[in-house]
């Protein structure tokens, strides 16, 4: 009951416009293209244990944040902040989904079965357990990229004009809309259409403010979430 009351109070503040909004961040955030053909609900993925196929249509009516993750990256500490983001915004209908990938600096080298133990005991360590769903390791760029990532990337402009150092990037062919590094993020709205894309170094606090601002606009338009 207390949790519901807290969520209700926070939502009231959000709708009233009393929560701070994100400031302009150059290309740390890009709005996605209008008139996108199709939705994320046409796709799905296997959970990290490989035992369950999750169709993304189960997230109809939810806000969904897609994040490509890695266990041995300088940004792996974002896992802790992502847990906090999931806990804080879940009452407003947000679900985070994590997709391990080894294409950036070979920083996710282990098997699927090794990823959760690595997070728990190595980095971030200290018994860490993600409170959001992780899926099987796979490619987010290149010839074998997962199809839903093709959809996400084609729906949103890139956050940087540069791809990065080629000897640390492991895919072909390279394209302008490709993900630049681990922990890039895409927000999909309650209708399954991509809304925003964030640079991997954008702070989670700014990501949160951007999401809250979008939720407020949706509420003002009378858009219902699940």
UniProtKB/Swiss-Prot annotation:
Keyword terms: Oxidoreductase, Peroxidase, Secreted, Selenocysteine, Signal
Gene Ontology CC terms: extracellular space
Protein name, per record: Glutathione peroxidase 3
PANTHER family (alphabetical): GLUTATHIONE PEROXIDASE, GLUTATHIONE PEROXIDASE 3
Record field: catalytic activity: 2 glutathione + H2O2 = glutathione disulfide + 2 H2O; tert-butyl hydroperoxide + 2 glutathione = tert-butanol + glutathione disulfide + H2O
Presence of the UniProt keyword Transferase in the record: no
Gene: GPX3
Gene Ontology BP annotations: hydrogen peroxide catabolic process; response to oxidative stress
Localisation: Secreted
CDD domains on file: GSH_Peroxidase (cd00340)
TM segment ranges: none
Entry's EC annotation: 1.11.1.9
Cell inner membrane among keywords: no
The species this protein was found in: Sapajus apella
Family: Belongs to the glutathione peroxidase family.
Tissue: Secreted in plasma.
Function: Protects cells and enzymes from oxidative damage, by catalyzing the reduction of hydrogen peroxide, lipid peroxides and organic hydroperoxide, by glutathione.
InterPro entries: Glutathione_peroxidase (IPR000889), GPX_AS (IPR029759), GPX_CS (IPR029760), Thioredoxin-like_sf (IPR036249)
Leader sequence segment: 1-24
Positions annotated as active site in the UniProt record: 73
């Amino acid at each position: 009951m207390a949790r519901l009351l807290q969520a209700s109070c926070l939502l009231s503040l959000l709708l009233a416009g009393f929560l701070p909004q994100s400031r302009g961040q150059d290309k740390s955030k890009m709005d996605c293209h209008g008139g996108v053909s199709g939705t994320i609900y046409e796709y799905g993925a296997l959970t990290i244990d490989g035992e369950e196929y999750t169709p993304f249509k189960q997230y109809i009516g939810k806000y969904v944040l897609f994040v490509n993750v890695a266990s041995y990256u300088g940004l792996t500490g974002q896992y802790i902040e992502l847990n906090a983001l999931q806990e804080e915004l879940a009452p407003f209908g947000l679900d985070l989904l994590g997709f391990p990938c080894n294409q950036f600096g070979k920083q996710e080298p282990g098997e699927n079965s090794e990823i959760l133990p690595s997070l728990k005991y190595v980095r971030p360590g200290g018994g860490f357990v993600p409170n959001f769903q992780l899926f099987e390791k796979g490619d987010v760029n290149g010839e074998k990229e997962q199809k839903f990532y093709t959809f996400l990337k084609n729906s949103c402009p890139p956050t940087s004009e540069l791809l990065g150092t080629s000897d640390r990037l492991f895919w072909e062919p390279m394209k302008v809309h490709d993900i630049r590094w681990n922990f890039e993020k895409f927000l999909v709205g309650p209708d399954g259409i991509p809304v925003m894309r964030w640079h991997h170094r954008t702070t989670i606090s700014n990501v949160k403010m951007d999401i809250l601002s979008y939720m407020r606009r949706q509420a003002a338009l009378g858009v219902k979430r699940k």
